[in-house]
Every structure is written in structure tokens, then in C-alpha cells.
Amino acid sequence: MGRGKIVIRRIDNSTSRQVTFSKRRNGLLKKAKELSILCDAEVGLVVFSSTGRLYEFSSTNMKTVIDRYTNAKEELLGGNATSEIKIWQREAASLRQQLHNLQESHKQLMGEELSGLGVRDLQGLENRLEISLRNIRMRKDNLLKSEIEELHVKGSLIHQENIELSRSLNVMSQQKLELYNKLQACEQRGATDANESSSTPYSFRIIQNANMPPSLELSQSQQREGECSKTAAPELGLHLP
């Protein structure tokens, strides 16, 4: 069974991308060396990795190769303006073709203009869509998981705040109840004292004296033990004829 067609696009996984770069870099350097030996060509190869590391190969001397390239480029561009125009025209045509291919690929991914695709092309498109959907779902699941964890944290904080507020309300209610009971007790004592002072009974008694005619005395009755006053009760003398 033959190898499947590899889609040429950027590798998202950094580890896989580094492994692929290492393998293909070694293969490219090997091919450049073989080309210089087999065809007696002067070859200069410069490669920069995504991290900025330099890899190079030259069949003779890299500086010599670069100088030769610079001189040839200047002769090509400076000697003939028409050639420069043609070069830019080819570059523009290549960019237009790349843009067209990208637009076609985008339409196919959106399910448009599929009539010109064969079974293999459709299978490749389906595989690309499945990979895209898998990546989208994975990203969505990660976002939802993060949001759920954040909501759990917020819920725990709110629950703790509610507990603290409930405790504070209970303390305030207890203090309010104690204050209310004290106020009620004070009001009851005040009312009792007022009733006792306003309803103190009076009694009459007849005082007889040998030297004086009999008289009628008005006096307050003795209050409850421990609450009566030590002052003498007022006397109202009525002399009988």
C-alpha cells in the first residue's frame, strides 16, 4: 500500500514540527552535497530554523558563493531592465496563482464548487475537515472547562460570603432581641412603679387624748416590705366637738 499524500502546510504541534524540520534539514543538506558532487555544481545552502539557529552548506566557500550570487544578480538586473520586469511579472503571476489556489481551497472547505473534485480529492478534503473539527472541538472543550472552573471558584467565594453574612445577621438579630427585652423590662418596671405610687391607700384612725377632744387621723398604709419610706405618714387631724 502506497504512502498517502502529505498536505503541505504548517505543522501546529511544536514537537512534531521540530522533528520534521530536523529530518528534512538533514535530507536537504544531503541532497545539496550530492548535487555538488554528481554535477560538479557550486552549491551554497543557508537554512534558519524557527528559533533563529543557522544551518549552512557550501561546496567551496560560503562567502565565495554569496559573492558570486551577488555579482550575477547585479549583472542580470542591471544589464537588462526588461529581464527585471519579466522577473516581477513572473512573481506577480505566481502570487496570483497562489491566491487563486487559496480561494479555491477556502470554497471547498466551505462546501462550494465540489463538482470538479474526484474521490481522492474529496477524501482528502474530508480528512482535513475532520482534523479541523477535532481541533475546534478540543479548543471549545478547553474553553468550557476553564469557564466551568472559574464559575466554581466564583460560586465558592459567593457561598463563603453568604455564610459570613448569615453569621453577621444572626449576631445582629441576637443583639436586637436582647436590646428589645431590656427595653421591655424597663418599661414594665416603670409602669409598675407608677401604678404603685398612684394607688397608695390611705387609712383613718381616731386619736384620743385626755387633755384634748378626740380627733380623726388620715395616714398612708404601709407599703411592701423593703420599699416603704421611713418618713412619717401625713396626719390630718379632725377635732370632734
From Swiss-Prot:
Any one annotated GO CC term: nucleus
InterPro entries registered for this protein in UniProt: MADS-box/MEF2_TF, MEF2-like_N, TF_Kbox, TF_MADSbox, TF_MADSbox_sf
GO annotation terms (biological process): positive regulation of transcription by RNA polymerase II; regulation of transcription by RNA polymerase II
GO molecular function, one term: RNA polymerase II cis-regulatory region sequence-specific DNA binding
Domain of life of the organism encoding this protein: Eukaryota
Disordered as annotated region, ranges: 216-241
Keyword RNA-binding: no
Tissue expression as described in the entry: Expressed in seedling roots and shoots. Highly expressed in young leaves.
Domain K-box: 85-178
Disruption phenotype: Increased number of tillers.
Function comment: Transcriptional factor that targets the CArG motif 5'-C(A/T)TTAAAAAG-3' in the promoter of D14. Directly suppresses D14 expression to control the outgrowth of axillary buds.
PANTHER family membership: SERUM RESPONSE FACTOR HOMOLOG
Protein name: MADS-box transcription factor 57
Protein species of origin: Oryza sativa subsp. japonica
